[in-house]
Amino acid sequence: MTAMTRTLSRIGLILFVVGFLSPLLMRKAGGEELWPLARQQRDVHRFSTLFLAQDIRDSLSNPSGIEKALLWCKKTGVTKVYIEEYRDGYQAKREAILRVKDRFLAEGFEVAGCVTTTKVGKPSTGWKDYISCYTDLKTQEKIRVIFEYAAGLFDEVMIDDFWFTDCACGKCDAARKARTVRIGNKSHPVPGDTWSDYRSELMVQLSREYVLGAARRVNPRVRLIIKYPQWYDQFHERGYEIVRQTSDFDRIWVGTETRDYDDKEWGGTVQYEGFFIMRWLGGAGAEKCGGGWYDWLGTTEKTYIEQARQTILGGARESMLFCYGGLQRETGPGNVEVLRGHIPELLKVAAEVKSRKLIGIAAYKPPNSEPGEEAKVFDFVGMMGLPLVPCHEFPAEAQAAFFSIHALKDPGLAEKLSRFIQSGKPVLITDGLASRLAGKVGLDRPNVIQLKVNSAPPSLLKLSGSEIDPLRASLLRPFKLEFLAPNRTALYLFDDGSWVVENFSNQPIEARLNGETISIAPRAWVCRWKQGEN
């Protein structure tokens, strides 16, 4: 019997399966009983929501609307609300904002502000219905005014994930070629002449001067939060520069809205991405990383709950339920009703995750790295039951590692990877990266496994369990683990021997972990936590 097998068998483990919650938990989630539980647990994990500027104008414009929102929040276990000052060209009125703010504070909620930088000034040549040209000096001034207004109302302000630009107008193109960013009357050099170079420098400098600087001049106490979108492979192309912006802002937030993979409008993202991006940005942001943010768009009740699970397994300290108004329509009410029934368990899982260190196969994505033909490959590899530990720095000390085309961003990759391979540790490398490293790194060693992505990461979902099992056998050897399961099954490992297995398929499955059979219902998870030694 291995050490891990003994660990899994040891008395003191707690087993519970989502989808088979106890009647007690379900009763507790039925009404306002959720509110005291959520308040008690908010230092472990809190649920929050956002009132759009338009919600303040419309549904929260009178006392009855505010009371309705209060009741909804309490029934949903929400203990913090964000009140938006600006969105889509509309700035909410000061009196209306303060009326909502004061009422929620009086009821014991935490309250913060929010800004969504859509339809500001000159439109972009790209997503022109929402995104702006920030080379335009008048548009920059409008940004300054918006954030001065928000900072005058709140000590904490989040920026929704439209804080980017995709403009390629004549002025932007000329500035890109000149390798110069101008913010007001100040000029800043740009290190290169690509659109990524220009837009990243533009958004970094604009944030420093007209977001952070402007807000702090009005309110020295204000904390600014930048929310990153879930499309992590394109951040730098549109001006999100996670190294400098994470350093500059007081906190960061993470978009974990994966939605339904098969949805015709919103689909194409597998559920595991919520976990991957939460952990990847959590590593880059460390204590600055506040939480995740997901919505109802393109979801079913099952995918909505999966977004919640992945956010919490990703180590988030807060789950933003976007947004109050949206959750009153379409799939929102059904999603929320199901979420309420799961919140007690989600809070318990959050407490267990918080007290442990994630372990597994290091998955290296350097900041600002290009995916080539392997976009989102990490998400699909995670769906194969390979327990990933996302990282933004080369994982020299990892026990096993996965490398994709993204790793080429690291100028020292060839030397670092050669040393890692020579150490004898298991390495999984994509065929795309292997072809680019031919003649530079010795890959013909028994500890190196090549993953055939064939320039189509979604094709990995078609691999059978029997095709994946040999990969797992090699890569999990340092952890003294054997894991057998179908595709669309995720494994999460912790340093004390605890684990979670989640079934993303629509059929019940049986997985085997070190000889133990684990039966998992469709779209459910099994969590096993080792007690007493944390």
What is the predicted role of each segment?
Residues 1, 5, 22-23, 75:
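Coiled-coil-like amphipathic alpha-helices with heptad-repeat character
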Residues 2-14:
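Bacterial N-terminal signal peptides that target proteins for export
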Residues 24-32:
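Signal peptide processing junction and immediate N-terminal pro/mature segment
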Residues 32-415, 421-422, 431-439, 444-462:
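Glycan-processing catalytic domains of CAZymes
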Residues 11-24:
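Bacterial N-terminal signal peptides
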Residues 382, 392, 404-534:
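A conserved amphipathic helix/loop scaffold
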